[in-house]
């Protein structure tokens, strides 16, 4: 593998991981905030706050 291809591969992998991991991290942070502060009132019905 030449360095340019390797760099592209690593960048693509990083972006994929970011897109995959960030929403779950965000959901966990929101759940933790709800546990500390209390449920947020402005969520649509059907979404567990």
UniProtKB/Swiss-Prot annotation:
Its main location: secreted. Residues 28-35 form a propeptide. Expressed by the venom gland. Contains 1 disulfide bond. It is found in: Secreted. Residues 1-27 form the signal peptide. Keywords: Disulfide bond, Secreted, Signal. GO terms for cellular component: extracellular region. Belongs to the formicidae venom precursor-01 superfamily. This is U6-myrmicitoxin-Mri1a. It comes from Manica rubida (European giant red ant).
């Amino acid at each position: 593998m030449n360095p340019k291809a390797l760099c592209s591969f690593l960048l693509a992998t990083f972006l994929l991981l970011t897109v995959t991991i960030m929403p779950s991290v965000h959901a966990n942070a929101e759940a933790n905030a709800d546990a500390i502060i209390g449920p947020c009132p402005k969520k649509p019905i059907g979404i567990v706050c």
